[in-house]
Regions:
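Patatin-like phospholipase
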Residues: 1-80, 86, 123-135, 143-147, ...
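Hydrophobic/aromatic beta-strand patches that form the interior of the parallel beta-sheet core
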Residues: 2, 110, 196-198, 268-272
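A short alpha-helix-loop-beta-strand transition element characteristic
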Residues: 37-49, 91-106
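Charged, glycine/proline-rich intrinsically disordered loops and linkers
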Residues: 42-68, 129-138, 218, 222-226, ...
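Active-site gating loop/helix substructures
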Residues: 72, 100-193, 197-228, 310-319
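C-terminal helical/tail subdomains of lipid-metabolizing enzymes
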Residues: 73, 77, 81, 86, ...
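Extended catalytic-interface subdomain
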Residues: 79, 83, 87-90, 106-111
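Acidic, Ser/Thr-rich peripheral helices and adjacent loops at domain boundaries
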Residues: 209-250, 292-296
Length: 343
């Protein structure tokens, strides 16, 4: 099982319940159905004001305070509540035994190093897999910890980077979706030949109405930030799926006796992705956010108007609220049932 960003958390939770997969899925679903923002980050007025004040201070007189590191904000929001939730809900201490008993072949989570610029996949495996090295990305065999999960899901600017030891030194990591050129590769390196890809990308979603009818208004900060984050989080998977499909097509044209001498092998993919635009879904739930967070986003141009999806992409990265997560789960179930024959 491999995962990146929020997918790393889901992957780890599934892996920790690999001896009873159905129970693990139900447990994860129960958490997502009852989710609230305060389980992920400090969403109260004091926490939001404290973070906002630090950023304002940095912008206004940061040049004068540069020598005082403790004044520099590390992120927009504090995700200590998420750390507590992970410790409670993801018992990583079970992994070695599950791997040893054959319930799980491997778990891999990916994060992006701010220190080296490399994209690193951390993995535990039953097989003696040699860590791979490719251009700007590599793998490291390691005991997966909650720090790895926090690093993989540390959305840039929004959540703080996490320090993890790599090759006997500490590097600081952020969200694994950054600079991720080959999200399917870890599963292939770990030996998978049939891969179920569950993503939040744009492969199956309808065309954006805003693209057909662009607004003449200057984009808000929220719209610009949402566009930038969407490019980070949503585009790489679709490109990698197309790459694997092209390689499969090429291999199908090569005679089997010659293909046997190649390191390449065909990979069977089944891709499940949303059939609706997630920013449109998010726009219906912006009003569910805690008032302090909604006020902060409002200053950037996010509105609670369900018809206005322009800033909703940014809000979707903070929308850890039950109304939104339940609608996403219902969408995922419907999209999967629509593909029941392939599944």
């Amino acid at each position: 099982i491999t995962g990146t960003s929020a997918g790393a958390i889901n992957a780890a939770a599934l892996a920790c319940g690999a001896d009873n997969f159905d129970r693990a899925v139900r447990r994860i679903a129960r958490v997502w159905r009852q989710f609230h923002a305060n389980q992920v980050y400090g969403a109260d007025s004091l926490s939001v004001m404290r973070s906002g004040a630090r950023w304002l201070t940095l912008v206004s007189i940061g040049w004068a305070l540069a020598r005082w590191r403790r004044m520099r904000p590390q992120s927009l929001l504090d995700n200590k509540p998420l750390e507590k939730l992970l410790v409670k809900m993801v018992p990583l201490v079970r992994l070695p035994r599950l791997i040893r008993k054959g319930h799980l072949k491997a778990l891999a989570v990916t994060a992006s190093s701010y220190s080296s610029g490399e994209h690193v996949t951390f993995f535990e495996s039953a097989e003696p897999v040699k860590p791979w090295v490719r251009s700007q990305r590599k793998a490291a065999r390691d005991r997966i910890t909650h720090e790895h999960l926090l690093a993989s899901s540390a959305i840039p600017f929004i959540f703080p980077a996490k320090g993890i030891e790599v090759d006997d030194h500490i590097e600081y990591f952020g969200d694994g979706s950054m600079r991720q050129s080959a999200p399917i590769a870890p599963a292939i390196h770990l030996g998978a030949e049939r891969i179920l890809v569950i993503g939040a990308g744009r492969m199956h979603e309808p065309k954006n109405d805003a693209a057909a009818n662009p607004t003449p208004n200057y984009p808000s900060l929220a719209q610009i930030a949402g566009h930038a984050l969407s490019n980070i989080f949503l585009d790489a998977l679709a490109v990698d799926v197309e790459r694997v499909q092209r390689i499969n097509q090429t291999l199908s044209l090569i005679p089997e006796e010659k293909r046997a001498h190649s390191a390449l092998r065909p990979i069977e993919l089944l891709v499940i992705a949303p059939s609706q635009r997630l920013d449109a879904v998010a726009a219906r739930h912006v009003g569910d956010l805690p008032t302090p967070v909604r006020t902060m986003l409002g200053a950037l141009g996010v509105t609670s108007n369900m018809a206005d999806v322009r800033g909703a992409a940014l809000a979707s990265y903070l929308l850890f609220e039950a109304g939104y997560t339940q609608e996403l789960m219902a969408l995922g179930r419907a999209d999967t049932l629509a593909m029941r024959a392939q599944v």
